A protein has these predicted regions:
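N-terminal and secondary-structure boundary signal
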Residues: 1-131
Length: 131
């Protein structure tokens, strides 16, 4: 279904990046919605800790919030930056950014399906799929 629609076959270990929802926020697509897609690609739900305060900013509390929001009921979950140090990828010819820090667990995957959204924060930054 999804692989036919995209025209791409996701191979090997597949990471599925979602926005799992902040505490008290209902503005995220529920795990039940993503369940058939994740099953089709045999994926693992992946997330990263946030750079701003809240339950998603620490490895100790982030998994608990994902459980509260129902993610662990349906999926294996990998918090990609739960163990450090980050992997540093160079950005050749980058105008502003010269390198990108990514969670170490990203190296455990062969493919990634990004189901997270992109957004501009009122704090003057960007978030969602971009982080």
């Amino acid at each position: 279904m999804i692989t036919l629609s995209l025209g791409v076959k996701l191979s090997g270990a597949v990471a599925v990046k979602v926005h799992s929802g902040e505490k008290g926020n209902q503005n995220f697509l529920r795990p039940e919605f993503w369940r058939p897609i994740v099953a089709e690609v045999h994926g693992t739900i992946v997330e990263t800790n946030t750079a701003y305060g809240g339950m998603r900013d620490r490895t100790e509390t982030h998994p608990r919030l994902m459980k509260e929001h129902g993610w662990s009921q349906y999926f294996d979950i990998d918090l990609m930056d739960s163990e450090g140090p980050d992997v540093i990828w160079p950005i050749p010819n980058g105008k502003v950014l010269k390198e990108n820090h990514v969670g170490r667990h990203l190296m455990n995957y062969d493919s990634m399906l990004v189901l997270a959204h992109f957004k501009g924060h009122p704090m003057g930054g960007y978030g969602g799929a971009i982080k």
